[in-house]
Amino acid sequence: MKFFMVVSALFITLFGHALAQFDYCFGKDTERSQTRQFTTKSAYQIIKGTNIDKQYLVPHCLPQKIWIFHRHGTRLPSRSIIEKASRLEELRDAIVKNYRVLRTAPSTNALCQEDLIALQMWKWNNSITPDMEEYLTSQGYEDLRGTARHYQKLYPSVLLKEYNNTYYLFRHTDTQRTTESFKAFTDSLFGIHNDAVAEKLPEKDKLLRPYDYCEPWAANNNDDENSEVNKYKRSVLWNDTLMEISTRLGFQYTLESKDVELMYDICRYEQAWQVDRTSVWCGAFTPPQVTVFEYAEDLKYYYKFGYGSDINAHLNCRIVQNMIEHLGSNALPNVQVFFAHSAGLQTLMSALGINKDDRPLTANNYQSMSERKWKTSNIDPFAGNFVAVKYECNNAPMEKEKVIFFLNQNAVDLDWCHVGLCNWSEVVQRYEHIINTDCDSYYCPGVGALSAKPISIAVTLLMSAIIYLINLI
């Protein structure tokens, strides 16, 4: 009897404890729904729509023109993250030591053996060096080949397989990742040995990078102490989440936010690089914890590129005018494709009023905004794209010209359109305030005021001097 009790106690100690602690296992999770919440580092294959094969068909209508704004495909991290590879290795070793040596794994919600072993075996890819920062990856190349192939399948009468420099217009920014994205897209459209060329890069690219030339936008600092994202990162929710993650990893103190965010970043990058495999670092986070991190990112981008600041809706004045002019013209080219960045795609959505919530996102409304429209995971994943297709409809009783907008292969359901199908005249009316404006002054409001400030100061000083002299007399 005594022997039985000892064995039972040993069994409970060894196995009962183990069973209790393995609550969530990323390696065994076949759904991994949280990978759809990786914001701007989400993999396109996970985010893209699945109903476009039905949505693009419009009875009695034929597609005539296509306009595409395409974010580059999956890329490598920034230099700052690449240079922290050694810190990731230190964190890996510390976590393994917590579990294998110090035995400080929590009694519940600990890493499962699969995730722990995978983390123990993880090594940084030393071929990724700082000089390769933000380069397009092989997966990023395939992202763009995939979107080109799919859109050409849907619209073969517009996206012709033969390249013609008057029929097609391509343009990209001055970066490796957008240049290579252009090459991947055109390789898929026309075959590998094609002669497609992009428009010459201007000295100042105010069409695709307007934010580079707008000082008031740059001065609208989203990183100051009182920004919503920084207030959120001082909240009980955020700090409790950091503590929970630290405990899950076996630490008996709360890790610094920068270390947890580094692990989260590499989790998202690695998952996007190899969609069909798992990033070992994603095992550090439970799905609810990812949701907390997702909101922090959405807050940041809401104020940096979205509806949180009025100036964001002005920045892409030129690209909106370009889209409307292209779709409204009967002249060539019939296809225009632009390859750019997150800032461009998100500010374009702000200019067009897409995915706009009735209430602003703030540090205090995390719970009530769980069903928000502004989710950068859905708006701006790697290879995110916004497509406008112009149709000519012969059987339409009133309006013969129609447009469908697609965001990442989902028809955009604007409340003034009919299940995604918009009357062209309504499109022109809705964006008339942008179409008829002077973008030089509209895109960057406040330039005049900023340039006038030194003058006004000089005038004030001059008047003060005059008054002083008069008083002396």
Task: Please name every model-derived segment.
Residues M1-F4, N471-I473:
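Positively charged n-region of N-terminal signal peptides that target proteins for export
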Residues A20-L169, T173-G448:
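Signature for phosphate-centric chemistry
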Residues K2-A9, S456-T460:
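Sec-dependent signal peptide recognition
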Residues L450-I473:
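Cleavable C-terminal sorting propeptides in eukaryotic secreted/cell-surface proteins
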